[in-house]
């Protein structure tokens, strides 16, 4: 397979590595899987062997032609040349799963899109920068990002496997991991509350005075990035029952 290097995207060297990673997922032969930023199709090919149906999305037209050529004999694979951030996820079957090696610079918007969608995936598996994933895991043991807090009520996140630089071409300059986000069977807040919750979290991280005015005194000595998930839920419920100070 011919591969083209693009900014902040490092491609897996072979389908063998992709198959090994899929082995660390909960993807099964009955599943519909989505490959985002499919490149020339290394992950797509591996997914075609491990799931019932694969939709591979690639935005770069030159790379898409290679993807088409490399997957034309795979009967359970459909390929689309579209911008994933504009793609309508409601077109996909319920409980689809995502497994992809995405461009690192698009990690946040891609995760945001997947996790706020009405038809969100049952499981998400992404190759990501290790430092970025640490901020997605809500814990008082590491600094958490606003995105990590926003996804916490709806998805359980963890690092599944560290990767070697030699797994990629070109080798990345940063440490990378295979990251899992599993949709909670019962979300910790309702899906209907998600837009308001997300706006609230964004403001709590961005505006220090808003944070200090809208959380309990016991949390004011901590930064937003230092709180545990359970503490954020407590703050959220406190704010819902308060006068909502701006």
What do the PLM-derived regions correspond to, one by one?
Residues 1-199, 203, 230-246:
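Catalytic cores of RNA-modifying enzymes
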Residues 1-2, 213-222:
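Short helix/strand-capping connector loops at secondary-structure junctions
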Residues 199-215:
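Flavin-binding catalytic cores
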Residues 221-231:
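Catalytic core of IPPT-family isopentenyl/dimethylallyl transferases
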């Amino acid at each position: 397979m011919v591969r083209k290097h693009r900014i902040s995207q490092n491609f897996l060297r072979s389908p063998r590595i992709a198959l090994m990673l899929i082995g660390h997922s909960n993807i099964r032969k009955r599943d519909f899987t989505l490959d985002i930023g499919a490149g020339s199709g290394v992950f797509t090919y591996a997914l075609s062997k491990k799931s019932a149906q694969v939709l591979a999305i690639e935005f770069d037209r030159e790379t898409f032609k290679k993807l088409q050529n490399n997957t034309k004999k795979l009967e359970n694979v459909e390929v689309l040349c579209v911008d994933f951030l504009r793609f309508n996820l409601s077109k996909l079957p319920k409980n689809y799963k995502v497994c992809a090696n995405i461009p690192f610079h698009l990690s946040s918007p891609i995760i945001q899109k997947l996790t706020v969608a009405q038809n969100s995936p049952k499981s998400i598996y992404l190759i990501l920068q290790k430092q970025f994933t640490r901020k997605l895991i809500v814990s008082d043991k590491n600094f958490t990002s606003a995105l990590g807090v926003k996804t916490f009520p709806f998805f359980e996140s963890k690092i599944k496997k560290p990767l070697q630089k030699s797994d990629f071409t070109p080798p990345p300059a940063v440490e990378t991991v295979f990251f899992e986000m599993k949709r909670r069977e019962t979300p910790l807040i309702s899906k209907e509350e998600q837009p308001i919750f997300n706006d609230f979290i964004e403001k709590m991280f961005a505006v220090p005075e808003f944070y200090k005015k809208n959380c309990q005194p016991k949390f004011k000595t901590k930064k937003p990035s230092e709180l545990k998930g359970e503490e954020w839920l407590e703050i959220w419920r406190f704010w819902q029952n308060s006068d909502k100070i701006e």
